[in-house]
């Protein structure tokens, strides 16, 4: 649902940038402890969330190729963005803990442009997801420091 959080368990490296740092066979995965802390934080605050794979790509909110989104959805990718794969790859290569918390701002099978327009207009449901992203991340950081 719009405003839910997604904790990315791995990213499909369809972004281009991560390939500049390491071969395509290198996995784009988060730090397990930080990912777990994010999940624990959401559970503690009753924040709706999903765990799953994200497709990172090089196109800003493009919906000109719906078949491509359908293809990856059939492969169980539950989200798409532009940053997660490179974040995970660089974090892993440099020994930095990473996790990716996404806010659902466009629903599957809906108009991406329309849903992004609602987000840009600061509709309450999308903005509440953004606030929950920030709070969850801050709480997760405190959890892994204990």
Residue ranges and their predicted role:
Residues 1-146:
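Glycine-rich phosphate- or other oxyanion-binding loops that anchor nucleotides, phosphorylated ligands
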């Amino acid at each position: 649902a719009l405003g839910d959080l997604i904790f990315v368990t791995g990213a499909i490296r369809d972004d281009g940038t991560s390939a500049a740092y390491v071969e395509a066979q290198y996995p784009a995965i988060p730090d397990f402890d930080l990912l777990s802390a994010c999940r624990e934080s959401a559970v503690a605050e009753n924040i709706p969330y999903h765990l799953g794979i994200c497709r990172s790509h090089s196109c800003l909110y493009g919906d000109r190729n719906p078949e491509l989104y359908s293809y990856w959805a059939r492969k169980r990718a539950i989200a798409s963005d532009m940053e997660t794969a490179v974040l995970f790859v660089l974090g892993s290569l440099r020994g930095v803990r990473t996790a990716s918390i996404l806010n659902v701002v466009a629903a599957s099978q809906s108009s991406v442009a329309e849903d992004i327009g609602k987000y840009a207009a600061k509709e309450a449901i999308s903005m509440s997801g953004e606030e929950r992203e920030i709070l969850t991340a801050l709480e997760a950081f405190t959890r892994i420091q204990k």
